[in-house]
Amino acid sequence: MSIILSEKSEQYLQKGMTSNFVVDIMFIEEPCTQIYNPTVERIKDVDLEKYKDYEKVSNQNLILYLSDWFIKIYGKLEEYHLDVSGILKKKLIITNIDPIIKNTCKIN
């Protein structure tokens, strides 16, 4: 497993001086729809202990901690492509997987 960084994400990481992120799932449920959206969130140094048992993927200056729920939904990927999203509030996103959208209504 490896991490591929876009040029923007490399710049973002250099500015933020942060190297630890958790990859998790944001679950959204609306009428007739369930959405599983992968998220990448910064981990504060004081919170690192909480993630010690998570599966890890790293390169020389970045560690991604994969939540059990992320692994259950998406599995372990060969590569994690990271880019930056957002206009005012920048954040990392995974670009090589899409949200899973499920239709939960039983329409006959």
Residue ranges and their predicted role:
Residues 1-108:
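Domain-level signature for proteins that mediate thiol-based redox and metal-cofactor handling
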